[in-house]
């Protein structure tokens, strides 16, 4: 499980950073890629990665500002031109209005897609659990921005315990089909009468990962709730230390506020995202250094960077 950042800039593209988009790569888990936001130029960034557009099965939009959605029509159209690859349907989750935006863009441009898009729109009254599969659950909660905006909490369901092969061999169980039966929870009786209780040879289930991906927001309790015990918290950092007032006026956060959210939520790792173009390389180091005085395990991400979860 990895996150690859396709755009880490704020507001408009710059030479160093494209606008908002990231890919949650779940290839080992479910052979899918989930996109979160799709700003202008996202498909260009994807061309610089190993991501295959057909593997993108779901797109989650945080809000309808242009720097988070203007790349959708282009990506959806390009996804249709995957030669020699089977076309697969796509699901888009986002605030009310995302369906109208996509369908209008496709209609006026005369674009016809050879696959179906299933839209899942929500408003302030229809948040909470928005998706559940056999391996993942996704929650959405409203943040505090200048327009309706949400954050997402992706929870991997607990993983099966592992089989203690060494202990089984010591108990006289021959390697082979019997191992598989025990792994599936089946109790056995060996030829010599030894009873093998499957539960004695399988470790406890392992907790799944928690990934929190926030849209644009002021510091808010909703961010903390979404990030409780998160393995990774992706939080915007449009402004730096000392800019709390201007950040609030524009519906954004500082690096220090993001660090405070990570502390209050008990998150394990903080990734600062949505970086303003006014920050030069030396300022990026300061963003991290300042935030680390509050939350030590912090990192400022850059375009095309891949982070293992």
From Swiss-Prot:
UniProt catalytic activity: Endonucleolytic cleavage of RNA, removing extra 3' nucleotides from tRNA precursor, generating 3' termini of tRNAs. A 3'-hydroxy group is left at the tRNA terminus and a 5'-phosphoryl group is left at the trailer molecule
Binding note for cofactor: Binds 2 Zn(2+) ions.
The entry's keywords: Endonuclease, Hydrolase, Metal-binding, Nuclease, tRNA processing, Zinc
Disulfide pairings: none
Cofactor: Zn(2+)
Domain of life: Bacteria
E.C. no: 3.1.26.11
Catalytic machinery residues: 67
UniProt-annotated binding residues for Zn(2+) 1: 63, 65, 145, 216
Binding site for Zn(2+) 2: 67-68, 216, 274
Pfam families in the cross-refs: Lactamase_B
Record-level Gene Ontology MF annotations: 3'-tRNA processing endoribonuclease activity; zinc ion binding
Protein purpose: Zinc phosphodiesterase, which displays some tRNA 3'-processing endonuclease activity. Probably involved in tRNA maturation, by removing a 3'-trailer from precursor tRNA.
Assembly mode: Homodimer.
Protein family (similarity comment): Belongs to the RNase Z family.
Protein name stated in the entry: Ribonuclease Z
Organism: Streptococcus pneumoniae serotype 19F (strain G54)
Designated gene of the protein: rnz
């Amino acid at each position: 499980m990895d996150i690859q950042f396709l755009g880490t800039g704020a507001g408009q593209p710059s030479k160093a950073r494209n606008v908002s988009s990231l890919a949650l790569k779940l290839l080992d888990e479910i052979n899918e890629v989930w996109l979160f936001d799709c700003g202008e130029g996202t498909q260009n960034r994807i061309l610089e990665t190993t991501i295959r557009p057909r593997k993108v099965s779901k797109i989650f939009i945080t809000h309808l500002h242009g720097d988070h959605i203007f790349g959708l029509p282009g990506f959806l159209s390009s996804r249709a031109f995957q030669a020699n690859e089977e076309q697969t349907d796509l699901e888009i989750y986002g605030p009310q209005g995302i369906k109208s935006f996509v369908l209008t863009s496709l209609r006026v441009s005369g674009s016809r897609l050879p696959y179906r898009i299933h839209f899942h729109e929500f408003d302030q009254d229809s948040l909470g659990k928005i998706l559940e599969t056999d391996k993942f659950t996704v929650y959405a909660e409203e943040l505090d921005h200048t327009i309706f905006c949400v954050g997402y909490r992706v929870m991997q369901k607990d993983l099966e315990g592992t089989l203690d092969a060494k202990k089984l061999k010591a108990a006289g169980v021959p390697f082979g089909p019997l191992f598989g039966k025990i792994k599936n929870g089946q109790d056995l009786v060996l030829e010599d009468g030894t009873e093998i209780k499957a539960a004695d040879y399988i470790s406890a289930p392992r907790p799944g990962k928690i990934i929190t991906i926030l849209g644009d927001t002021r510091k808010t309790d909703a961010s903390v709730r979404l990030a409780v015990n998160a393995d990774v918290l992706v939080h915007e950092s449009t402004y730096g230390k000392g800019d709390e007032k201007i950040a609030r006026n524009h519906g954004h956060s500082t690096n220090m506020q993001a660090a405070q959210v990570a502390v209050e939520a008990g998150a394990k790792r903080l990734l600062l995202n949505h970086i303003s173009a006014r920050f030069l390389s030396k300022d990026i180091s300061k963003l991290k250094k300042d935030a680390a005085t509050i939350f030590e395990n912090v990192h400022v991400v850059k375009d095309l960077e891949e982070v293992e979860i």
